């Protein structure tokens, strides 16, 4: 029997506000343990939460970006559970009235087709702290993350393969990043994914029993974990067994999913309205204000890059996959840089450098200004493409102006015939054997002089001018 795969994803995104959702403490990542905490995060008796308006702003933007309806009358709820990283023994979240509902996002699949994936809801909530289990037998709790604002985006069970789940996450990450509400860095925990997967016989409308997957720390592992579950569940069903509703984690080392616990249901959390936060209303004016702050999204940028700038669909997709790269490209083109040349550099030398250094574009000294200046001095013949690669590395590490560096470093290309012709004559004088081979008609003997000339000029001879002059002087040499 063949089975249809049914997948839904729950994505937690940390919102990039300066302070936490219910306390004035910093929400920034990377500080010392428990440095970003106060009495609200510690749940001291008598302290009360105060809602951060910036979190609601971000929630509205997310809902608009994901084509969602917005609940204009909102409240928060308590989700009750005990764990050491949750000192209140409950989490403030949204249960029956999330900020956004009934949305969708269009994704592009590997075969070039598109599919619309429904989004059931997006709700605001606070993050929990972090437990670390030491080798000394003690467990340690860091509450820096406690109270960091989250939006949980819950898809419909519309995905029918791990490939579609991967495409959905890629599209969702782009939209959230462009909306400016999160950096969506999985390595820092600002984007976390749980997957729900079940199988059912083709033609059956009722969903099968689902399994939840956790510990999916990359899009690649989401795909691998889902692929493993498809095989595991299919084998159980074909052998006459039944799937249990359970939570499993993906073990990257063994490339398998491992049982964590039997899955709880919503009733286990005993949700009830949060009494310390009153009901509040989101006005139409507030929604429209947030709408005006939304930028052009990846899909629209890609279309513009193709229609207005003449880029290929592939180049447009690569450039818009990351907002930082796309914004860099936008500024470089606005400064007069040739769109195709800027695109080639960003996808070629710049991407290779970032991969080798393990850095992002924001972490190096390259700017749209000095990249455009470098492209300009390539085009006007000041430097060759070969020398430009060395210039780029300097700019990426040290910044500054491209032309100024080239002139100070003595890298300016030699294009003046009055300088090159005497050097060519000296090359002839220094390589008498090669001259003799050329005059005797030895095959490809002329090719050697190109290398001799570039060596004599330390690679600074303008290749086009130098080859033309070399051919001219070799012709004269043959006549004599």
UniProtKB/Swiss-Prot annotation:
Which UniProt keyword terms apply here?
A: ATP-binding, Ligase, Nucleotide-binding, Protein biosynthesis
Enzyme Commission number(s): 6.3.5.-
What InterPro entries does the entry give? Asn/Gln-tRNA_amidoTrfase_suB/E, Asn/Gln-tRNA_Trfase_suB/E_cat, Asn/Gln_amidotransferase, Asn/Gln_tRNA_amidoTrase-B-like, GatB, GatB_C_1, GatB_Yqey_C_2, Gln-tRNA_amidoTrfase_suB_CS
Q: Does the keyword ATP-binding apply?
A: yes
The reply on keyword Ligase is yes
Question: Tell me, which GO biological process terms does this entry list?
Answer: glutaminyl-tRNAGln biosynthesis via transamidation; translation
Q: What reaction gets catalysed by this protein?
A: L-glutamyl-tRNA(Gln) + L-glutamine + ATP + H2O = L-glutaminyl-tRNA(Gln) + L-glutamate + ADP + phosphate + H(+); L-aspartyl-tRNA(Asn) + L-glutamine + ATP + H2O = L-asparaginyl-tRNA(Asn) + L-glutamate + ADP + phosphate + 2 H(+)
- Single GO molecular function: glutaminyl-tRNA synthase (glutamine-hydrolyzing) activity
Q: Which domain of life is it from?
A: Bacteria
Q: State whether it acts alone or in a complex, and with which partners, per the record.
A: Heterotrimer of A, B and C subunits.
Sequence similarity? Belongs to the GatB/GatE family. GatB subfamily.
Q: What does this protein do?
A: Allows the formation of correctly charged Asn-tRNA(Asn) or Gln-tRNA(Gln) through the transamidation of misacylated Asp-tRNA(Asn) or Glu-tRNA(Gln) in organisms which lack either or both of asparaginyl-tRNA or glutaminyl-tRNA synthetases. The reaction takes place in the presence of glutamine and ATP through an activated phospho-Asp-tRNA(Asn) or phospho-Glu-tRNA(Gln).
Q: What's the protein called, per UniProt? A: Aspartyl/glutamyl-tRNA(Asn/Gln) amidotransferase subunit B
């Amino acid at each position: 029997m063949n089975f249809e795969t049914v997948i839904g994803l729950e994505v937690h995104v940390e919102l990039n506000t300066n302070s936490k959702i219910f306390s004035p403490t910093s929400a920034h990542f990377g500080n010392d343990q428990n440095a970003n905490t106060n009495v609200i995060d510690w749940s001291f008796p008598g302290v009360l939460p105060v809602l951060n308006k910036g979190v609601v702003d971000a929630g509205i933007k997310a809902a608009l970006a994901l084509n969602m309806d917005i609940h204009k009358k909102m409240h928060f709820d308590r989700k009750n559970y005990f764990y050491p990283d949750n000192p209140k023994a409950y989490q403030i979240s949204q249960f029956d009235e999330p900020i956004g509902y009934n949305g969708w996002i269009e994704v592009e699949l590997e075969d070039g087709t598109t599919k619309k994936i429904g989004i059931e809801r997006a709700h605001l909530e606070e993050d929990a702290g972090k437990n670390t289990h030491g080798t000394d037998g003690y467990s340690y709790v860091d509450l820096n993350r406690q109270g960091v604002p989250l939006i949980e985006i819950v898809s419909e069970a519309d995905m029918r393969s791990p490939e579609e789940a991967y495409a959905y996450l890629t599209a969702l990450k782009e939209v959230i990043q462009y909306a400016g509400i999160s950096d969506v860095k999985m390595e820092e925990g600002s984007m976390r994914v749980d997957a729900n997967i079940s199988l059912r016989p083709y033609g059956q409308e009722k969903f099968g029993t689902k399994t939840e997957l956790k510990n999916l720390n990359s899009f690649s592992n989401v795909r691998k974990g889902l692929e493993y579950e498809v095989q595991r569940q299919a084998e159980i069903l074909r052998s006459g067994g039944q799937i249990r509703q359970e939570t499993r984690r993906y073990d990257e080392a063994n490339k398998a999913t491992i049982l964590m616990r039997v899955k709880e249901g919503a009733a286990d959390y005993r949700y009830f309205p949060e009494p310390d936060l009153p009901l509040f209303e989101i006005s139409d004016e507030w929604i429209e204000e947030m709408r005006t702050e939304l930028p052009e999204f990846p899909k629209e940028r890609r279309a513009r890059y193709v229609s207005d700038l003449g880029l290929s669909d592939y180049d447009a997709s690569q450039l818009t996959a990351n907002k930082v790269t796309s914004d860099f490209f936008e500024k470089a083109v606005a400064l007069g840089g040739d769109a195709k040349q800027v695109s080639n550099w960003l996808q070629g030398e710049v991407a290779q450098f970032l991969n080798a250094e393990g850095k992002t574009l924001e972490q190096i000294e390259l700017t749209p200004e000095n990249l455009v200046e470098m492209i300009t001095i390539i085009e006007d013949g000041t430097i060759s493409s070969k020398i430009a690669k060395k210039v780029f590395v300097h700019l990426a590490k040290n910044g500054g102006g491209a032309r100024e560096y080239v002139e100070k470093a003595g890298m300016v290309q030699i294009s003046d015939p009055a300088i090159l012709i005497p050097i060519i004559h000296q090359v002839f004088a220094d390589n008498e054997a090669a001259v003799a081979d050329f005059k005797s008609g030895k095959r490809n003997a002329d090719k050697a002089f190109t290398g001799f000339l570039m060596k004599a000029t330390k690679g600074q001879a303008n290749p086009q001018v130098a080859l033309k002059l070399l051919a001219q002087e070799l012709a004269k040499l043959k006549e004599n």
